[in-house]
């Protein structure tokens, strides 16, 4: 009887103690997360910087393009390196090829004398690259996968995919991107855009 009575006294106290311990551990974990979050955000902001922020914000507003998409393209294309040049000849922060430059210049009506050699200048590269994203948005529709695939593989290839039921079920979006490098590029840019939004919105 005495043992039973002791158990009746001890068990509620033990359960209460364990509950308090669990609460204390939860509070410690929560506090640790709150303390570490600013440091983690700082590390992420260094990994995903808003380089050329003024230029990107200015031309994104001018051409009605999501600035986070422009940051993501710059990050994946060149890691914001203005002197970047690919093995196929794409130049600058947004890695534009010369035929694309000529097309954008014509569509912009730019008669300032800007040349492809100036694509190594961040302002020229960002203006032309952002304008190209805007033009693709108007030509190919609002779907970002389609826009980015067009930026990477060209409008002709993407239009052919949209017309092929194997790649597009509705003619407006891409269910599958047949070029593995373009598929990787699109997914990587969208993933990077989401990180920028999470960090800076």
Locate each region found by the language model.
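A general, composition-driven signal for non-globular sequence regions
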Residues: 1-2, 7, 28, 71, ...
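Catalytic glycan-binding domains that act on GlcNAc-containing polysaccharides
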Residues: 33-201
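N-terminal export signals and maturation junctions of secreted/periplasmic proteins
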Residues: 2-58
């Amino acid at each position: 009887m005495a043992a039973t009575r002791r158990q009746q006294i001890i068990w509620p106290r033990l359960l209460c103690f364990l509950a308090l311990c669990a609460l204390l551990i939860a509070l410690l974990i929560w506090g640790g997360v709150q303390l570490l979050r600013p440091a983690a955000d700082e590390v992420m902001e260094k990994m995903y910087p808003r380089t050329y922020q003024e230029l990107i914000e200015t031309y994104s507003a001018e051409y009605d393009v999501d600035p986070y998409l422009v940051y993501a393209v710059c990050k994946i294309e060149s890691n914001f390196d203005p002197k970047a040049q690919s093995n196929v000849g794409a130049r600058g922060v947004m890695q534009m090829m010369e035929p694309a430059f000529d097309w954008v210049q014509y569509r912009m009506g730019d008669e300032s004398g800007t040349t492809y050699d100036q694509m190594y200048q961040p302002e020229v590269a960002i203006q032309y690259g952002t304008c190209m994203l805007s033009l693709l948005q108007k030509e190919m529709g609002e779907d970002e996968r389609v826009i980015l695939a067009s930026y990477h593989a060209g409008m002709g290839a993407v239009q052919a995919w949209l017309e092929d039921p194997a790649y597009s079920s509705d003619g407006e979006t891409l269910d599958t991107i047949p070029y593995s490098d373009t598929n990787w590029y699109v997914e990587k840019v969208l993933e990077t855009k989401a990180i920028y939004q999470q960090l800076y919105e």
